């Protein structure tokens, strides 16, 4: 367990903040750490910046993430890891597809040969659009307040997917599922970063399992071929209490 001091914060959008800090550990793009706040709990988080300084971009969901949103320089938290496999990055032109705060996990693989499709519910919830030149940026919003009016999988019909050597995707699981189906129909090469309920991060509790695959050990990044016939991906998941719930695919 490593004690981390926040050096700098940057607000990305309402209820979204990046915490920058120093940590002398190598982290591969796509790997995650377990973030612990004493008295509140522990959650998995991917890094949005893996160089120096490192950074974690947080969206307020629960009590731990809300407490992190409220942090200022000098505040402390604890992390262990890194865990997981990370992205298999290849040279050549690539497309990253980020839904909501999921785009944060994809930032470390973006380079000058990267196009980005960034989506959110509304214009106000879009983040990191300033990281990409206009010629390489595509935007989609659920309500049409910015860019394409619709969802990422619908926008893909407008792109020539064949120009991309590989596509990398991160976001809410219903969005990942639809994008996976679309890319599979296009015979595209793609990797997906999954987020599931996670207690241990090291393969003991099995709460993060998706169709027999442990997200913490065999993921969180999976190749499209591992997911296209997975019986649970995009269908159901286990909550922190162990209850199985079905995802809203509307």
Swiss-Prot record:
Binding site for [2Fe-2S] cluster: 200, 205, 208, 216
GO molecular function annotation: 2 iron, 2 sulfur cluster binding; electron transfer activity; flavin adenine dinucleotide binding; metal ion binding; oxidoreductase activity
GO biological process: one example: 'de novo' UMP biosynthetic process
KW Flavoprotein (keyword) present: yes
Family listed: Belongs to the PyrK family.
Assembly: Heterotetramer of 2 PyrK and 2 PyrD type B subunits.
Protein name as annotated: Probable dihydroorotate dehydrogenase B (NAD(+)), electron transfer subunit
Pathway: Pyrimidine metabolism; UMP biosynthesis via de novo pathway; orotate from (S)-dihydroorotate (NAD(+) route): step 1/1
Gene: pyrK
């Amino acid at each position: 367990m490593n004690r981390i001091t926040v050096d700098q914060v940057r607000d990305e959008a309402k209820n979204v903040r990046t915490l920058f800090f120093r940590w002398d550990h190598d982290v591969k793009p796509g790997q995650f750490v377990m973030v612990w706040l004493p008295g509140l709990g522990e959650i998995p988080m991917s890094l949005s910046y893996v160089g120096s300084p490192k950074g974690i971009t947080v969206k307020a969901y629960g009590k731990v993430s809300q407490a992190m949103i409220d942090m200022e320089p000098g505040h402390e938290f604890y992390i262990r890891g890194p865990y997981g496999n990370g992205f298999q990055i290849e040279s050549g032109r690539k497309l990253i597809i980020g839904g909501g705060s999921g785009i944060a996990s994809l930032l470390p693989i973006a380079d000058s040969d990267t196009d980005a499709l960034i989506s959110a519910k509304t214009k106000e919830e879009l983040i990191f659009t300033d990281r990409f030149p206009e010629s390489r940026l595509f935007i989609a919003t659920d309500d049409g307040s910015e860019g394409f009016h619709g969802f990422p999988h619908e926008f893909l019909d407008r792109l020539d997917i064949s120009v991309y050597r590989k596509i990398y995707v991160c976001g809410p699981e219903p969005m990942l599922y639809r994008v996976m189906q679309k890319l599979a129909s296009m015979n595209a090469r793609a990797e997906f970063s999954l987020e599931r309920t996670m207690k241990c991060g090291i393969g003991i509790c099995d709460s993060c399992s998706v169709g027999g695959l442990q997200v913490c050990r065999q993921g969180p990044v999976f190749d499209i071929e591992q997911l296209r016939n997975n019986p649970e991906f995009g269908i159901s998941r286990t909550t922190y209490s162990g209850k199985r719930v079905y995802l809203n695919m509307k």
